[in-house]
């Protein structure tokens, strides 16, 4: 028995009927309203767009923002730094200096502000100081001095037993009972130096270089304490000064201490 290949009969009308039936099945199962679009209407395109309406809207890439310039970055940095610095200073003042509205913390010592001005041929010195009572048993003393010319300046807090002298003697180094109970220490210190040109004092026709120094010192004191004094040491080419200033026991006085040398 021999097998013979059967001929394949192709009926064009039948294939067209099958193709149309399959397309109708897809439309009926999806039940999606079609929209007008520029995509070629093919079977694959119909299948893709029937599931996602306007798919290009979901993947639209926004245009990139213009890159900020160097000046904009610098301005933003300084604005941020100024805001951060202002916030930190406010927090520091809030922690260290609580608001006290009662009158009993108004005056703790006989003076509040300190001012000293020293002028010589070689140096011009201005020292200012201020006491701030925190109301919680502690207080701060802030010093600032500006000098123009040549010289060394030292401003500090000492107990009343501190000896006023130019040279340090062996007796002055001995600690007394009062100095041991002196609970004050430096909390902050900063010094800035610069040079400028000006007319010479000895010869106005010439130009001399002058050194400018600005210092900020902050002291913090706590109990127990009785009396504190400001100790100033100043050395220059033509002038020497050692001065101790103590507060007045008449704490009702509102007049600040003024010293001119």
From Swiss-Prot:
It comes from the Eukaryota. The keyword Glycoprotein applies. It comes from Mus musculus (Mouse). Its main location: secreted. May be proteolytically processed at the boundary between the N-terminal non-conserved and the central conserved domain in neuron-like cells. GO terms for cellular component: extracellular region. PANTHER family: NEUREXOPHILIN, NEUREXOPHILIN-2. Glycans are attached at residues 83, 136, 146, 152. Rodents express at detectable levels only neurexophilins-1, -3, and -4. GO terms for molecular function: signaling receptor binding. Residues 23-87 are annotated as: II. This is Neurexophilin-2. Residues 1-22 form the signal peptide. Belongs to the neurexophilin family. Residues 88-166 are annotated as: III.
């Amino acid at each position: 028995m021999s097998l013979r290949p059967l001929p394949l009969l192709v009926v064009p009308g039948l294939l067209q009927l099958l193709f149309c039936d399959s397309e109708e099945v897809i439309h009926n199962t999806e039940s999606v309203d079609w929209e007008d679009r520029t995509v070629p209407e093919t079977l694959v395109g119909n299948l893709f767009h029937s599931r996602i309406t306007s798919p290009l809207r979901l993947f639209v890439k926004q245009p990139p923002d213009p890159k900020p310039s160097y000046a904009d970055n610098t301005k933003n940095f300084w604005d941020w730094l100024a805001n951060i610095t202002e916030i930190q200073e406010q927090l520091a003042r809030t922690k260290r200096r609580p608001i006290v509205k009662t009158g009993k913390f108004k005056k703790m010592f006989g003076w509040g502000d300190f001012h000293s001005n020293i002028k010589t041929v070689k140096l011009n010195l201005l020292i200012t100081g201020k006491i701030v009572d925190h109301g919680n048993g502690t207080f701060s003393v802030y010093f600032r001095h500006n000098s123009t010319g040549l010289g060394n300046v030292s401003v500090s807090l000492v107990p009343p037993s501190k000896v006023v002298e130019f040279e340090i003697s062996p007796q002055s180094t001995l600690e007394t009972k009062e100095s041991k109970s002196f609970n004050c220490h430096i909390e902050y210190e900063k010094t800035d130096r610069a040079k400028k040109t000006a007319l010479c004092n000895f010869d106005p026709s010439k130009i001399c270089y002058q050194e400018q120094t600005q210092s900020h010192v902050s002291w913090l004191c706590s109990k127990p304490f009785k009396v504190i004094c400001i100790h100033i040491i100043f050395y220059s080419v033509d002038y020497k000064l050692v001065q101790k200033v103590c507060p007045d026991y008449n704490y009702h006085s509102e007049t600040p201490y003024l010293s001119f040398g």
